Regions:
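The feature marks the mature, well-folded catalytic cores of soluble enzymes
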Residues: 1-125
Length: 125
């Protein structure tokens, strides 16, 4: 893997583009809710809903669920019978991966590139 800095190039300049929402996906990445300062009731209701969403998606596409170290064992247990959900231990700030994780762009050859959006918590960082 090679890191390309913004000073070297941009995805658009290199012929990469955001695939359509209906385009086939290799997998879906999700983050396990854990922040008790933003999720009510110790994040348990949110975890239940995220599990339901992951299971629905996994009927069609593999899901990679990222859980922090403290919640990893619990998350792994939740999905122990779900063969199309892979739980990965990863430090995350929040479960909202649209803001905090990479998104992927493609080119006409099918190559992929991950974008880092430099998210700053809506000015909070």
């Amino acid at each position: 893997m090679r890191t390309i800095t913004e000073s070297e190039s941009t995805p658009k300049a290199d012929g990469f583009f955001m695939p359509a929402e209906f385009a086939p996906q290799d997998r879906v990445w999700m983050g396990w809710p854990h922040r008790t300062d933003t999720w009510a009731h110790g994040a348990k209701p949110a975890q239940k809903q995220y599990a339901a969403i992951a299971r629905a998606i996994s009927e069609f596409t593999p899901v990679y669920m990222c859980a922090n170290q403290v919640d990893y064992a619990n998350c792994k247990a939740v999905f122990e019978n779900d063969e199309n959900v892979t739980v990965i231990e990863m430090t995350t700030d929040d479960a909202w991966f649209r803001d905090t994780a990479a998104t992927y762009v493609i080119n006409v050859k099918g190559e992929k590139r991950a974008n880092h959006w430099h998210f700053n918590a809506y000015g909070g960082l």
